[in-house]
A protein has these predicted regions:
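Glycine-centered short loops/turns at secondary-structure junctions
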Residues: 43, 171, 193, 301-303, ...
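Flavin-dependent oxidoreductase catalytic cores
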Residues: 1-284, 288, 292-299, 398
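Anion (oxyanion) recognition and catalysis
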Residues: 127, 168, 298, 341, ...
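General small-molecule cofactor/ligand-binding pocket signal
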Residues: 175, 346-350, 386, 456-458, ...
Length: 540
């Protein structure tokens, strides 16, 4: 079928779009109405019509997208004519008592595009046909930069203020969606009269019990969405050509969650048989993986000893106590600590597990959650540099001008933190792409934030030598020396060697599991998922 739209154009995929005529509009309005009646006959209470994100309604309402010169373009009344035709057809088809909700952009964040004032005026026109309004923002082709799917670098509740403007134009209930992950923000926005209700999307994957926990006063037990895009990283349709899977594989990937290991499991956790017996399990390592494994095993009736060699739980996630871009990840780390503390888990801090004492805890099995450490490759002059992670806990006091050797996720995120706190950072990366182990929307959000902050980025650049005053590098422009007050390196991570511990445990007949970075260095989602799967195995 040919593509049609408000105007003649060529879309991102190179497909020519024909401008719609009135016959097209009548057919599409009728299709909307028929679809709504199908939902009504199927027993649903209502439908939500998505009019935002650069879809059909936005294409007509936006003065930037709709440049028609007939009665469907120009003034707001003209641009609203076809969207109102659709809503009117739907309402007439389903009758007065069926819910018809409308999701609409408060702004598309495009110069010359939609404004909250115009959206408010449109909502006033649509009042006879709809029952409530969802305020969102942005366009599909620029999901990250326009806030359609907000990142951790966007403010929470980024559409609430625009919803408050739109609310002035209508008596209908107005809600906001986007970046809302706390009951406190919901309550505040409603109490201030900015919205009538809050809408949660990704947050309900992070914690489906959000509303129930808030109702019971257990806000501190809510797993709050990180906006990390694990659940949906983007798609080829949106122009992401760096996704490490096909469209078919993407369909299987969607719905996973970094902080909720139960999301998208290949089985229903509610159907798990109870543990056949109670066992004692020793968990070595108190990072994210170790804590999640302890929580899961304890909840299944097992006796848990959680041994952490340091004075605090948290592992590598303790860097979030400092990094101002990671408040939600810090909240998750703190939640895991609280969840461990409120359970009957025997926590042993400042406890080093050795091959000699691993059998002295009376455990039936051992879960190794020993994590990873920064790699220190043989770069000439590496002794003049410091590990990037060391600056988070005060081991390093960086100077003003910093060169970060290694532009993977750790190097980029640590460099971004330093840039935002007043330092001048240059990131040097051998590969042609920074943050190469990331992809899709998160990588776009990270690189965009780095660009906005003025970080210098040198991909396809080899580090030849680190000196007391800088870094000697080589790229297509030749050899040069980058001056630096401090040189940091983030050149990968390596798993802590657990071979002697594992051998000692297995020699004594103990069951063993390896989870998280102890398997191989990875991300938080790999830690929580492997931890949950190990935790449910204890006692089986």
């Amino acid at each position: 079928q040919e593509a049609i739209g408000p105007i003649e154009t060529t879309n991102l995929a190179g497909v020519k779009v024909r401008p719609m005529n009135e016959d097209d509009m009548a057919r599409i309005a009728r299709d909307f109405a028929v679809s709504a009646t199908y939902m009504q006959k199927a027993g649903f209470d209502g439908v939500l019509i998505h009019g935002g994100h650069g879809f059909l309604f936005t294409q007509f309402l936006s003065p930037l997208m709709n440049t028609r010169t007939d009665s469907y373009g120009g003034s707001l009344e003209n641009r609203a004519r076809f969207p109102l035709q659709i809503l009117k057809a739907v309402r007439e088809a389903v009758g007065p008592d069926f819910l018809v909700e409308l999701r609409i952009d408060g702004t598309d964040h495009q110069p010359g595009g939609i404004t909250p004032e115009e959206t408010g005026a449109f909502v006033a026109m649509a009042e006879p046909y709809i029952t409530s309004v969802h305020v969102t923002c942005g366009i599909y082709e620029a999901s990250v930069k326009s806030g359609t799917e907000s990142s951790m670098f966007h403010p929470h509740g980024l559409n609430i203020d625009n919803a408050a403007i739109i609310k002035k134009y209508t008596k209908l209930p107005v809600g906001a969606v986007g970046g809302i992950n706390s009951p406190e923000l919901c309550e505040q926005a409603i109490a201030e009269g900015k919205i009538d209700f809050a809408i949660l999307g990704r947050q309900m994957l992070a914690d489906p019990e959000f509303a129930n926990k808030a109702k019971r006063g257990h806000e501190d037990q809510i797993r709050r969405c990180l906006r990390c895009y694990k659940c949906f990283p983007g798609s080829p349709e949106e122009g992401y050509d760096d996704l490490p899977f096909t469209s078919e594989e993407l369909a299987l990937y969607v719905g996973h969650c970094t902080i909720n290991p139960l999301a998208h499991l290949p089985f229903d956790p509610d159907t798990l048989a109870p543990a056949s017996k109670q066992e004692t399990v020793l968990i070595v390592g108190g990072g994210a993986a170790g804590m999640q494994a302890a929580i899961t095993a304890c909840d299944r009736g097992q006796k848990v000893i959680l041994a952490e060699q340091g004075p605090r739980l948290g592992g590598l996630l303790r860097f979030t106590d400092v990094d101002t871009d990671k408040p939600d990840l810090m909240n998750f780390k703190n939640l895991l600590v609280r969840e461990v503390e409120r359970r009957d888990i025997d926590v042993r801090l400042n406890t080093v597990i050795t091959p000699e004492n691993i059998t002295s805890f009376g455990a039936d099995g051992v879960i190794f959650a020993t994590g990873s450490l920064p790699s220190c490759p043989p770069v000439p002059g590496i002794g003049h540099a410091h590990k990037a992670m060391d600056m988070y806990d005060g081991k390093v006091k960086p100077g003003h001008k910093i060169v970060m050797v290694g532009g993977g996720l750790v190097g980029c995120e640590a460099g971004l933190f330093l840039q935002k706190t007043g330092h001048e950072v240059t990131v040097v990366e051998l590969l042609g792409r920074l943050a190469n182990e990331s992809f899709g929307m998160y990588r776009e959000a990270l690189i965009w934030e780095m660009e906005k902050c003025g970080m210098a980025m040198l991909p396809k650049t080899r580090c030849l030598e680190i000196t007391p005053t800088g870094v000697k590098v080589e790229n297509a422009g030749g050899v040069q020396t980058l001056e630096a007050d401090t040189v940091l390196f983030a050149l990968g991570m390596k798993s802590v060697d657990i071979a002697p511990l594992k051998a000692a445990a297995e020699a004594a007949g103990l069951k063993t599991w390896v989870i998280g970075d102890a398997i191989q260095p990875g991300k938080v989602d790999q830690a929580t998922r492997s931890a949950y799967l190990a935790g449910i195995e204890v006692g089986r």
